Amino acid sequence: MEPFAAYPLKCSGPKAKIFAVLLSMVLCTVMLFLLQLKFLKPRTNSFYSFEVKDAKGRTVSLEKFKGKASLVVNVASDCRFTDKSYQTLRELHKEFGPYHFNVLAFPCNQFGESEPKSSKEVESFARQNYGVTFPIFHKIKILGPEAEPAFRFIVDSSKKEPRWNFWKYLVNPEGQVVKFWRPEEPLEAIRPHVSQMIGQIILKKKEDL
């Protein structure tokens, strides 16, 4: 009687081919995914890599603010923090604006529906009532699947999702969030950190000369 090993396994050939095809498909999928991550990463590792809309609906690249300190704020017109917060933002921008610093305001209506105005109306309201000169962008969503990508980056990188209006996030010249403040925190709590960051920017520019 011939040994069992002498009989050929006829079905092994097609199975091996199917396995090879499936393996190739899996490897291709993995490679495409890794390539996608490689190309996406440079566009999402900095706040300044995003584009947003201004109050008039025009596209603005945040790249123009790179190299400066930025205070990113979700603002609202009909909030109990509106008056004090806009005064604080105006003072900070007035004091540090000429020295590599910007306040970047993003209106949002998701917190107590306290921003019913249109983007243009918000800009006009802030200019007329508080004399602000810093950029006020298009009204956005911060919470949920329709959140503005630029602000979602702020939230994800800081691990601090705003719970109300006028949360303030300090972004360094490279586009990373380094500090945040809740709406009830006073100007005196923010000023030293902004001043320190601006001092570092000025010192670096002198060293690069």
Curated annotation (Swiss-Prot):
| Annotated keywords | Acetylation, Membrane, Oxidoreductase, Peroxidase, Transmembrane, Transmembrane helix
Q: Name one GO molecular function term.
A: glutathione peroxidase activity
> How is this protein positioned relative to the membrane?
Single-pass membrane protein
For this protein, what reaction is catalysed? Answer: 2 glutathione + H2O2 = glutathione disulfide + 2 H2O
Instruction: Give a yes or no for keyword Signal in this entry.
Output: no
| Membrane-spanning residues | 18-40
Top EC group: oxidoreductase
In the record, biological process GO terms are: response to oxidative stress
Q: Can you name a GO cellular component term?
A: membrane
Where, per UniProt, does this protein localize?
Answer: Membrane
What EC number(s) does its UniProt record assign? Answer: 1.11.1.9
Query: N-acetylmethionine: which positions carry it?
Result: M1
Query: Membrane among the record's keywords?
Result: yes
> Which residues does the Swiss-Prot or TrEMBL record annotate as the active site?
C79
* InterPro entries listed in its UniProt record: Glut_perox_Gpx7, Glutathione_peroxidase, GPX_CS, Thioredoxin-like_sf
> Which family is annotated?
Belongs to the glutathione peroxidase family.
User: What protein is this chain from?
Assistant: Probable glutathione peroxidase 8
Organism per entry = Mus musculus (Mouse)
